[in-house]
């Protein structure tokens, strides 16, 4: 629990600093960095024990912050909304290996979700491996993960 508290303090401090960015508050890159760092730290905390776990948190936070900042620098709210809706649709209905694309006509950014292997986790939930690809300003970024179907029908990323 102490580790989670430290992560929350870092996330809160970062968001407070980002709020000082000016009248608009937190920008897209700051938001991406914050969310990527927090997600990376949380993922990193799942590995190792003691000092090894702290190393995992640090590495996860750093990698997540870098990737999140790069993606957030170019993605706007509409991009994120389109990507999330497409992810939900792809995970629920698309056959493994098929690409389900989204495209923002206002800025030309686009991406696609490729669901892969479907399996049941230890609690019986349906889960899927997937690849998320986004192209922002002509630069492609890929992320790999797993998501599980929740009782309400929504898919939640588990790593």
Swiss-Prot record:
Protein's cellular compartments: Cell outer membrane
Pfam family, one: Rick_17kDa_Anti
This protein's record includes keyword Signal: yes
Covalent lipid sites (S-diacylglycerol cysteine): 20
Chief location category: membrane
Lipid sites, type N-palmitoyl cysteine: 20
GO CC terms, sorted: cell outer membrane
Family recorded in the similarity comment: Belongs to the rickettsiale 17 kDa surface antigen family.
Protein's recorded name: 17 kDa surface antigen
Organism name: Rickettsia conorii (strain ATCC VR-613 / Malish 7)
Gene coding for it: omp
